Amino acid sequence: MRLFVGLGNPGSKYEGNRHNIGFMVVDEIARRHGFSPWRRRFQGETSEGVLGGERVVLLKPATYMNESGRAVQEAAKFFKLGESEVVVFHDEIELPPAKMRVKVGGGIAGHNGLRSISAHLGNEYRRVRLGVGHPGVKEIVHIHVLNDFAKSERPWVAALCETVAEHAELLVSGKDSQFQNRVHLAMDAKGFATENNGGKD
């Protein structure tokens, strides 16, 4: 069994924010793979289904980003899951738009959602880092991630969410490198430049 966590802030006010791309991805996984309707649970919303023959629970914490770890800890404890069985989808300003990287453990790069999860669960969970770009000035990062994606960005956002959802079963079986490569090739084929030469790891 796996717990897939999408990070974001609850409510229509934040729906289109860059910070909410994690929510967008798990919504697309649920839609594409015919998961159960979303229901309130574990200080958030959950949807359940099967990917690659394995049971997967999707979780969208409703605690707001800074307290995401409370919901993740509650769900992981209920299902008796360790850190390695948790996959977190989150926005990553240190990656250019439309890029994606998978990482296990490591630093949190100032991401408050990851900080909260690491504090409540431990640090060795897997992260699917979804590039939203850096505004160029540290002082306006907060504004950048809490702004909606620009109209011109929406095509790659939709393509990235669809592509990640399409290949998500590779994450279930721990084939992170294969997953990353498949997403990279698919995004390239769709016309979005995702060459492996940008962003900090």
From Swiss-Prot:
GO CC list: cytoplasm
- Kind of enzyme, top EC level? hydrolase
The feature of type site (Discriminates between blocked and unblocked aminoacyl-tRNA) is located at 9
Q: Quick check: keyword Acetylation in the entry? A: no
- Give residues annotated as binding tRNA: 14, 64, 66, 112
Q: Name one GO biological process term.
A: protein quality control for misfolded or incompletely synthesized proteins
Sorted keywords for this record are: Cytoplasm, Hydrolase, RNA-binding, tRNA-binding
Matches recorded under Pfam families: Pept_tRNA_hydro
Indicate the secretion signal residues: none
The answer on whether this UniProt entry bears the keyword Secreted reads: no
Q: What would be an example GO MF term here?
A: tRNA binding
In chain numbering, where does the site feature Stabilizes the basic form of H active site to accept a proton fall?
91
The UniProt catalytic activity note for this protein reads: an N-acyl-L-alpha-aminoacyl-tRNA + H2O = an N-acyl-L-amino acid + a tRNA + H(+)
The subcellular localization recorded is: Cytoplasm
| InterPro entries recorded | Pept_tRNA_hydro (IPR001328), Pept_tRNA_hydro_CS (IPR018171), Pept_tRNA_hydro_sf (IPR036416)
**Catalytic residues in the record:** 19 (proton acceptor)
Describe the task this protein carries out. Answer: Hydrolyzes ribosome-free peptidyl-tRNAs (with 1 or more amino acids incorporated), which drop off the ribosome during protein synthesis, or as a result of ribosome stalling.
Self-association and partners: Monomer.
What's this protein's name?
Peptidyl-tRNA hydrolase
Question: Per the UniProt entry, what species is this protein from, by scientific name?
Answer: Afipia carboxidovorans (strain ATCC 49405 / DSM 1227 / KCTC 32145 / OM5) (Oligotropha carboxidovorans)
Taxonomic lineage per UniProt?
Answer: Bacteria, Pseudomonadati, Pseudomonadota, Alphaproteobacteria, Hyphomicrobiales
